[in-house]
Amino acid sequence: MAANWLLLDGSSLMFRAFFGIPVGTFKAPDGQPVNAVRGFLDMLARLVSDRKPKALVVATDEDWRPAFRVKVIASYKTARLERGAMPAELQPQEPIIWAILNAIGVEVMGAAGFEAEDVIASLLPKITGTVEIVTGDRD
């Protein structure tokens, strides 16, 4: 049975798409890499086709290392501090992905100071029916 709601951790899936397709495999006419755009849209199409949700929300990280979480766990995502939060080739692709989703009517939600999983958790009490959460995060 299909879930009524499909909630996606968009930031996590965007990183998976970026690292899953080598940079340079797909380029925009201006030469900019769009591997993450292509990979994300392919994943989204497959998820919607396979799961047939009645409603879809893509949550985003507006802060990948929230202060409230670091206060509790000082080492939270410290490895990313050394290598940087986002690869340079991915940065220009992020707004393209969110713009495409908005253009096709997919709700994209984020909250300042929070990660996508926090946004998803805040939606759950407001949702009736079955829910499926899709993320690449392991925490």
Language-model-detected regions and their locations in the chain:
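Noncatalytic, basic helical substrate-engagement surface that gates or grips nucleic-acid strands
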Residues: 2-134
